[in-house]
């Protein structure tokens, strides 16, 4: 994928005889028309872009799956069910991290390919092809940034709702709302000595231990999920600076206007040069025609004059005298 753009494009005619027959096309190589290389590069470029879009859609699907799992986990009261939900969410986050890293590598590859493509004639910095490729890659990075923000808000929501769930479980067992210190202790460690001692004394060991096991399982799930989401967030943060820089570059209208003006000026200069070449070509064509006419006159005129002179000399020469017959004899 690193080499997205081919630097050569050849079309070899059919016919394996290689006899040099132009009509049959044997062994004849034809140069590509202007812009063929750029067109082929753009085709390959957009194929890679579609592949990256598929990966981004998978990230969105995983984000929705995590959101649904988090909503479903609010009604769970069994440690085993919470453990199964934790395994499912861990698998989703692991898949999201893997896909995010793949997208990151592919975007970096597109950046390198864009830099290499700027050396192709007609595809330099500021050209329409370069602007198209740069804006498309920047759009993909913005989509990835939006996905990052979705996962970040999901992580914050899971952490907040986890504290609410722990508070509800505490209230279910003790009949009292936990203070901030107790809630922080339960949310951060999954354990609470005061909670255990008081609850066991009031309601019995079995029921309380079940609730505590659920809280501990939820704590493990949230802690692991938060760690994985932070890792995913770091993958996105590695590209945040590039996204911001490219966004400013794309939004800088003045820069694009200046580039467009430079292309217009360059095109005007090329038109002036082409017009001069056209005038020069016409001038030399007229000179060549005049020289050719002079040569024709120099070569043909003596021949014509000689032919005319020969005709005149032949018409002016006297006819030979006819001898008179001899007199008759007697």
Curated annotation (Swiss-Prot):
Induction summary: Induced by infection with the fungal pathogen Magnaporthe oryzae.
Membrane topology, as annotated: Single-pass type IV membrane protein
Stretch list, region Disordered: 1-39, 311-330
Cellular compartments annotated: Cell membrane
The keyword Transmembrane helix is assigned to this record: yes
PROSITE patterns: SYNTAXIN (PS00914), T_SNARE (PS50192)
Main location: membrane
InterPro entries: SNARE, Syntaxin, Syntaxin/epimorphin_CS, Syntaxin_N, T_SNARE_dom
Skewed-composition ranges (Polar residues): 1-10
Stated role: Vesicle trafficking protein that functions in the secretory pathway. Involved in plant defense by mediating host resistance to the rice blast fungus Magnaporthe oryzae. The interaction with SNAP32 may contribute to host resistance to the rice blast fungus.
Quaternary state and interactors: Interacts with SNAP32.
Full protein name: Syntaxin-121
Record organism: Oryza sativa subsp. japonica (Rice)
Lineage: Eukaryota, Viridiplantae, Streptophyta, Embryophyta, Tracheophyta
